Design a protein with these regions (language model features):
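Active-site-proximal, structured, solvent-exposed surfaces of multi-pass membrane proteins
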Residues: 178, 182-278
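Generic recognition of flexible, low-complexity loop/linker segments
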Residues: 43-49, 55, 120-133, 201-204, ...
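Extended recognition/assembly regions associated with phosphoester-bond processing machinery
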Residues: 113, 131, 138-139
Length: 278
């Protein structure tokens, strides 16, 4: 008898709880999967995404080194991450913040589009990062920077400096489009190399993935190529025509490589041995 009473009480409790719970959670308001909240495309985003080139960067003038929205759709100069590479943070502190302030000042004072173009021309560090678009108002089309250097380029001069302080200081005076600054720890990479101007030399980005980039070069003589990609030695491997090739750091933060004369394929691929072995 006690068993039946216990079962009866349990059934009554279950029915009572079920009827009460259904008032608050039923088929009409139960959602099996929470909808994903994404950043809504702005006018600026839509205009930029019409550009189908493989890789370029976007600068949002609204707090670019902390905001996250630009990185959702584009390769952002800020590239938000809570733990930035120290070297990149130092580039921000020593160069990019000042150039950003100059651009913002130009927007505040410019009377013509030519005034703004002059400001972009005076931002070599932003240009070597291939900053093609400037978002000044998300609901307006962005401005295109015609002075961005592109994905990669050849330089006419190499300047070897004594240390890291001299390397970043040199960015205040050189034109990175024509001169590469190299820390003396990489001096052997350019030992014996004599830059020769080759007006017909070309370097193009053929394929882009975050962990693999493929370029084609055509030159009449050996050239020094600088790539608008962050130099990070651990895990990155470089090849020329499928054979291992050396690359090194230039201009404080970028990749550089000596490229032999002729037509060649250059591949950068991220292959960390610890990950592959595991």
């Amino acid at each position: 008898m006690a068993t039946f009473v216990g079962i009866g009480v349990a059934v009554l409790m279950l029915v009572d709880l079920w009827t009460v719970d259904k008032r608050y959670l039923n088929d009409s308001n139960f959602i099996r999967q929470k909808p994903t909240e994404v950043y809504k495309e702005t006018v600026a985003d839509q205009e930029i995404m019409k550009d189908k080139d493989l890789s370029y960067r976007v600068l949002n003038l609204n707090n670019p080194f902390l905001e996250t929205t630009t990185s959702y759709y584009h390769h952002s100069v800020g590239g938000y991450y809570a733990a930035k590479l120290r070297r990149y943070q130092e580039l921000i502190d020593h160069r990019l913040q000042g150039e950003l302030n100059s651009v913002i000042g130009a927007f505040q004072k410019a009377q013509t589009a030519e005034d703004l173009m002059g400001a972009f021309a005076a931002c070599p560090s932003l240009n070597m990062l291939n900053t093609r678009y400037i978002i000044y108002n998300p609901e307006q089309p962005p401005l295109r920077n015609p002075f961005a250097f592109g994905n990669a380029w050849f330089v006419d001069k190499v300047e070897v400096v004594e240390n890291a302080d001299a390397e970043i200081a040199a960015l205040n005076t050189i034109n990175p489009l024509t001169t590469a600054v190299v820390d003396k720890r990489f001096a052997n990479e350019v030992k014996g190399f004599t830059p020769q101007l080759d007006s017909t030399a070309t370097i193009t980005l053929d394929s882009y993935r975050p962990n693999k980039l493929v370029y084609t070069t055509k030159t009449n003589s050996e050239q020094l190529a600088v790539f608008s990609e962050i130099y990070y030695q651990p895990g990155w491997e470089a090849t020329i025509d499928g054979k291992p090739a050396s690359h090194f750091r230039a201009d404080w933060i970028l990749r550089a490589m000596l490229v032999p004369a002729g037509e060649h394929q250059i591949v950068f691929e991220f292959r960390p041995q610890g990950y592959i072995t595991a």
